[in-house]
A protein has these predicted regions:
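Mid-domain Rossmann-like dinucleotide-binding core that forms the NAD(H)/NADP(H) cofactor-binding site
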Residues: 119-188
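C-terminal capping/lid region of NAD(P)-dependent oxidoreductase domains
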Residues: 267-269, 283-300
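Glycine-rich phosphate-binding loop and adjacent beta-alpha segment
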Residues: 178, 209-269, 276, 299-300
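A glycine-/small-residue-rich N-terminal strand-loop-strand element
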Residues: 68-91
Length: 300
C-alpha cells in the first residue's frame, strides 16, 4: 500500500510516499481503509525531531494520528463495530491507504469523511483542557490561538457548556471566531488592555493553544497562575501555570462531539484539503500557522 513516511528528521520535504506492507488489526484494534486523515501540529513536531529528545530516527516512520474511513478488519475482542462501518478515530501512521486505529467512534451519517478526520485530536484536547482548567458555566475564558484546529473545537464546546469565550487570532480570522461564538481580539502588544476592555469583570481562566509566549499576560488577566493552562508552551510551569500533554479519554470526547454534531450543536470546519501526494504541503501549511479550522489529507 501507499503511505507517507520520513527516513530522517527535518523539514516537510523529508516526507515521501512509499510502498509498504499493509498493517493489520491487533487485539482491541480495527483497521480502516482511510478516506481522510487530519493534520495536527504534533505530526510536524514529531517529523521535525522536536519530540525525539536528541535521539536519531532509528527507522523510517509513518506520520499522522487522526483518520476517518471504513472498517475492513476487526481485531480480537472488538464487538462495537463490524467490517463496512464508517468510523473516525486515532491511531498511528494514518497518512496511508490503510491504518490501524486504537480508539474510534461511529461516524454520523451526515458528517463527511473529511470533516470527521479533523475531529479526533482537537476534540479530545479541547474537552480535556476545558475540564483541567476548571472553567465553569457563566465564567469567561480567554483562548490564545483560538482559530486553529484545537481552538476551533474549544470555542463551540465551551459555548455549549455556558462559558463566554474571548479568542485571539489574526485580523483575517476575526470573523471566523465570531462564527464559532467567540468574541475576537488580536494578539500581540496591548493584549492585556484589549481583553480588559472586552471583559470588564475579568477573565476566569485562560488557555494557551498557540505557545506564543503569552503566559505572563494570561496570568495577569486571570490573577492566578493555576487558572492558566497551556498545551504548547512547556515553560509555562516556570510561571506557575499548568501544562497538559496526555490524552485521557479520546473515545469519550469523540463520542461527545459526534453527538453534538448530530444535534446540530457542533461543527469543526475544514479550511483546506490536500491529496496524499501533497502531505508535505499540508504539514508546511500547519506549521506556518494562521489556519482557520482544520487541514485534512484525502486518500483516494
Amino acid at each position: 500500500m501507499q503511505a507517507v513516511q520520513f527516513a530522517e528528521y527535518g523539514s516537510p520535504q523529508v516526507l515521501r510516499i512509499v510502498e509498504v506492507e499493509e498493517p493489520h488489526a491487533g487485539e482491541g484494534q480495527v483497521r480502516i481503509a482511510v478516506r481522510a486523515a487530519g493534520v495536527n501540529a504534533i505530526d510536524w513536531k514529531i517529523r521535525a525531531g522536536y519530540m525525539g529528545r536528541g535521539r536519531p530516527l532509528g527507522q523510517p516512520s509513518g506520520t499522522g494520528i487522526d483518520a476517518a474511513g471504513v472498517v475492513d478488519e476487526v481485531g480480537e475482542g472488538v464487538s462495537d463495530v463490524a467490517v463496512g462501518d464508517a468510523v473516525f478515530g486515532t491511531g498511528r501512521a494514518t497518512f496511508a491507504e490503510y491504518a490501524v486505529l486504537s480508539s474510534w467512534v461511529a461516524k454520523p451519517s451526515g458528517l463527511s469523511f473529511e470533516e470527521a478526520a479533523g475531529y479526533p485530536v482537537p476534540v479530545e484536547t479541547a474537552t480535556r483542557i476545558l475540564d483541567e482548567v476548571g472553567v465553569q458555566p457563566g465564567e469567561t475564558l480567554l483562548v490564545s490561538g483560538a482559530s486553529g484546529g484545537v481552538g476551533s473545537a474549544v470555542v463551540p464546546i465551551a459555548r455549549q457548556r455556558g462559558i463566554s469565550v474571548i479568542g485571539t487570532a489574526s485580523e483575517r480570522n476575526q470573523d471566523y471566531l465570531r462564527s464559532l461564538g467567540a468574541t475576537p481580539t488580536t494578539y500581540g502588544d496591548g493584549l492585556v488592555d484589549r481583553v480588559r476592555d472586552l471583559a470588564p469583570n475579568g477573565v476566569d481562566a485562560a488557555l494557551d493553544i498557540a505557545g506564543s509566549g503569552v503566559i505572563p499576560e494570561l496570568i495577569e488577566l486571570t490573577g492566578e497562575p493555576s487558572r492558566v493552562l497551556s498545551i504548547a508552551d512547556f515553560g509555562a510551569s516556570e510561571h506557575g501555570a499548568r501544562v497538559s500533554t496526555s490524552s485521557r479519554n479520546a473515545a469519550g470526547a469523540m463520542a461527545e462531539a459526534a453527538q453534538l454534531f448530530t444535534e446540530g450543536a457542533f461543527t469543526l470546519p475544514v479550511e483546506r484539503t490536500f491529496p496524499l501526494e501533497k502531505a508535505a504541503e499540508a504539514q508546511a501549511t500547519s506549521e506556518a500557522g494562521h489556519v482557520a479550522g482544520r487541514l485534512v489529507v484525502t486518500v483516494p
